[in-house]
């Protein structure tokens, strides 16, 4: 009993940690702390599991969404700020008429909302271009462009719409690198399925509302269901979405400009795209990442 008491108190000092750094060793031991009370065999099995993860470079991805520093720095690499821009080649001027957020899902592709990727300048924007910028809207060479920026606030690139499902409000845009304008594409780790989610699960929202680059907030899942189920309380929802659209209502605060930004679970996997803010309740609504995956792999 004295040996067991010392083991539970001190852990196994004889594990082979190979070339792991001090921080990695501490993290391995921390992850296996609970298994110590079940004995040496259980503890050694846990150590082996997490040592392999550390050697494979995935250990620190295990719970990045809950670890403030590592989480934000890691997840930010896969999130982009999106600007919708009118480019007047005749006048050599640009006019930004909207912004949103997006998430990198492959080495070339970014998911966002269609109401971001397919936004059009409104009458106020066009009036400003005509009266204040002196654009000739009929004769000047003008093009609508999407620009993406990493959350480092430095690197910019063009992007083009390549796939859309407007009744799910999911669009996929493609990074269009040029010599001076390109970004490092670091995709999200994995998609988490809608069926794996439960009410009360931790979530983290990321985006750039109002041009506030890299805004993040946390909360938990409050409701899971389809647009058809939601229509009982929000009848107008079916005007914009298919009945089978999967929604996640959560407590991570989002704002105008958060649209298209990712919603992550506690493992740093994407579970949805933030899409709606309820007008009648303090609810933040994301469309399931299942719909991103369906569109990504569709023909």
What are these regions (language model features)?
Residues 33, 37, 51-52, 122, ...:
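Sec-exported extracytoplasmic/periplasmic mature domains
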Residues 76-94, 176-190, 215-299:
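Active-site region of chymotrypsin-like
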Residues 90-93, 123-138, 233-239:
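Intrinsically disordered, low-complexity Ser/Thr- and acidic-rich flexible linkers and loops
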Residues 1-74:
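N-terminal targeting leaders that route proteins to membranes or the secretory/organellar pathways
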Residues 108-126, 134, 139-207, 211-215, ...:
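Conserved active-site neighborhood of the chymotrypsin/trypsin-like protease fold
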